[in-house]
Amino acid sequence: MKILNDPIYGFITIRYPIILNLIDHPYFQRLNRIKQLGLSYLVYPGAHHTRFHHAIGAMHLMQNAIDVLKLKEIEISEEEELGALIAILLHDIGHGPFSHALEHTLVKGVSHEDISILLMNKLNEEFEGKLDLSIEIFRNNYKKKFLHQLVSS
C-alpha cells in the first residue's frame, strides 16, 4: 500500500502493487508531460493539470464509487475492483501532445482510445495477462456494464 498526495483530492491510497508498477511504467509516466487542458494554460496560467494528475484522480474517484457500491451490497469482486481501477487509470494513456487539440491532426482516423487499447495490450503482454479484465471493462465487453460506464463517464 502507498499513499500519494494529490493536488485536488489530497491523500490517495494505492491498495494494489500492480497499480504502482503501472504508474511507474514509462508509458504512464509520459502522461506527466501531456496537459489535460490542452492549450488552455496559454490563456489561464493556473491551468497546469496533466493527464497524469487526471488519471490518478479518476482512479481515486473510481475507488470511492466502488466502495460506495459495495456498501450498498452491489457484488464486486476484488478482481473486478482491480480491473476497473486499472481500466480507468489507463483510460487516457493513448493521448498525444496537447491532448484533444491535436488528436485528429497527428494521425487521421485514429482516436486516443484506439491508441490507449494498443498500449494497454502491450502492457498486458509485459504484465503477463494481468490486464485482461481491465481491457474487457475498457472495451465494454465485460458482463457488468456499469463498470465500463464508470470508466467512460
Residue ranges and their predicted role:
Residues 1-35, 42-85, 94, 98-153:
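Sequence-structural signature of the catalytic-core scaffold of metal-dependent phosphohydrolases
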